[in-house]
């Protein structure tokens, strides 16, 4: 004979896997061509000089140099560029 009443089922208990987004190379860091600088959803950061943008809005270095973050334009957008060393 059972000594506990049957436990009910739950509809919770799921969560999505983290996507590891964010800045991967910070300002002043040296990068090689092809290095990923920022992984993002949408254009939180925009591509500046010597920076390419992937189809998932990932920013990556097009040339060797140092990473530079700057705020430009009338809408105060954040740009990431690479300055030659």
Curated annotation (Swiss-Prot):
SUPFAM superfamilies the record matches: Ribosomal L27 protein-like
For this protein, the record's InterPro entries field holds: Ribosomal_bL27 (IPR001684), Ribosomal_bL27_CS (IPR018261)
Keyword Mitochondrion attached: no
Gene Ontology CC terms, in alphabetical order: cytosolic large ribosomal subunit
The similarity comment for this entry is:
Belongs to the bacterial ribosomal protein bL27 family.
PANTHER family xrefs: LARGE RIBOSOMAL SUBUNIT PROTEIN BL27M, RIBOSOMAL PROTEIN L27
**What GO biological process term is on the record, naming one?**
translation
- Molecular function as annotated in GO: structural constituent of ribosome
Q: Does the keyword Ribosomal protein apply?
A: yes
User: Keyword set for this entry?
Assistant: Ribonucleoprotein, Ribosomal protein
This protein is called Large ribosomal subunit protein bL27
- Map out region (Disordered) in residue numbers: 1-22
